[in-house]
Amino acid sequence: MAFYDSFDVAVCGGGHAGIEASLACARMGLKTILITQSIDSIGRMSCNPSIGGIAKGNIVREIDALGGEMGRLIDRSMIQFRMLNKSRGPAVQAPRSQADKIVYSSLARHVVETTENLSTLMDTVVDVLTVASDVPLPKDSSGSLESGSIPGEKRSGSSYAFATQACRSGMRQKIIGVVTERGRIIPCRAAVLTTGTFLGGRIFIGEYDAPCGRLGESGVFGLTESLSRLGFTTGRLKTGTPPRILKHTVDFSRFELQEGDKKILPFSFDDEKIERPM
């Protein structure tokens, strides 16, 4: 093991959430490190390269209002804009943009790499290091630990094992660092896990399956077990990707062209007009 520089915050994962988390911390003056498997994959849009849609479009504007970057990134990488549900009332209308995903990722990487207080590291976090804090977990009037104060305790009718002996004794756990796949120990006061679909990931192609993150990228193995040891419960979600087809096998004459809107509403409140990528 080799010790790395210490940080206030370690953000694990360079997708949309990791970008916003690392930028927010760094802009508040916290010494931050963004740890990602590949610098080239920061902000990578995996499947349908779009931002916004029902509910999600509102969230993007809320992120922008809080100082986030997603709205500005999509405004600068947009290739088509549509306001969904224009025939219905304003309550269900939602902005959505298709992005040039190469440009989006490139812009996101540039912002990350040029932000003060923010460092990047190509590696994979596989373990979270904690110690018992000197701050006790909250107790109720009878002196028992309050419901919900321990990760993994009984809740909503389901029973899970307590986290660690320290939790059983009523002591909080506090983050002291993370461990990476390449044997680095990175001391930090807080860790933000934005791992997306990579934790213990598997890919299924027909009857074939194998450990994987995205196609051609490694999954993350070890971090799930680390969280389980701390008392967190984990589950598995599934995402499906439509098959890719060869362009020359498609008869585009049978398709109906769907134009974008001429009136474009920027996602960012800072933008008055849209600069499309060349």
Residue ranges of model-derived segments:
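Short hydrophobic core segments
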Residues: 187-195
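Conserved acidic residues
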Residues: 8, 176, 189
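Intrinsic disorder/low-complexity segments
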Residues: 133-172
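N-terminal Rossmann-fold NAD(P) dinucleotide-binding loop
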Residues: 18
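Conserved phosphate-binding elements of NTP-dependent enzyme cores
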Residues: 11, 21-22
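Conserved beta-strand-loop-beta-strand element in the redox core of flavoprotein oxidoreductases
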Residues: 129-132, 171-184
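Conserved N-terminal/central alpha/beta ligand/cofactor-binding core
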Residues: 5, 23-127, 182, 194-214, ...
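Beta1/beta-strand and adjacent pyrophosphate-binding region of the FAD-binding site
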Residues: 4-15
